[in-house]
């Protein structure tokens, strides 16, 4: 059977059920009470979610059946770990876990590992790219980025290719005795980045769980690009307080992103 050019052996997508939010919640409650029939129905009712996710990996030359099986593992993990007490849609919670499971599978089955030095070059290249865009109001060429970094053009291309798989916004890329620097700090919002749609949905849902002060601090830090000291001056607290509030907010958000 074919769904948007993804072939899955043994899956008749035309007969896959579609569950409404209310029905999903009722099934989840029933599952928590040990109802195995409800669990099976819930899994079948969310297989379309897995199919929609694996379409994003179409161009990698991977076997769609394998990706589907791995995606189903991610779906089941999502079901087992989903917290009904949180006001979050199941799909919002499940999609990142399904994608994460597929990425782990791809990493584990890829003989090429991305070295620390390559990642460092890639992050520096992304920083330079953002700076040049801000300065010139247009996308820089790879040659321009390489010139800024004073390294060969081919090295920049190789490094950026090596981190093609999207990286978590909360992945620390540097930390000293002070605050960690996250990818979110270094890369501006870009609609063309892979999975930007997913990050946008997840971040919006996660931000709803924060206090007004936490929202304001994260908006100023990561969307307005201000330093912790600038935020502290703006809202009238110390830099240390900003740091603590920021870390607490990020910790809360990581539960949902």
Curated annotation (Swiss-Prot):
Family: Belongs to the sigma-70 factor family.
Keyword entries, A-Z: DNA-binding, Sigma factor, Sporulation, Transcription, Transcription regulation
PANTHER family the record matches: RNA POLYMERASE SIGMA FACTOR RPO (PTHR30603), RNA POLYMERASE SIGMA-G FACTOR (PTHR30603:SF17)
Gene Ontology molecular function: any one: sigma factor activity
InterPro entries: RNA_pol_sigma-70_dom, RNA_pol_sigma-B/F/G, RNA_pol_sigma-G, RNA_pol_sigma70, RNA_pol_sigma70_r2, RNA_pol_sigma70_r3, RNA_pol_sigma70_r4, RNA_pol_sigma_r2
GO BP term (any one): sporulation resulting in formation of a cellular spore
Top-level taxon of the source organism: Bacteria
CDD domains xref list: Sigma70_r4
Gene3D superfamilies: 1.20.120.1810, 1.20.140.160
Location of the DNA-binding region in this protein: 228-247
Job of this protein: Sigma factors are initiation factors that promote the attachment of RNA polymerase to specific initiation sites and are then released. This sigma factor is responsible for the expression of sporulation specific genes.
Polymerase core binding, short sequence motif: residues: 66-79
Protein name: RNA polymerase sigma-G factor
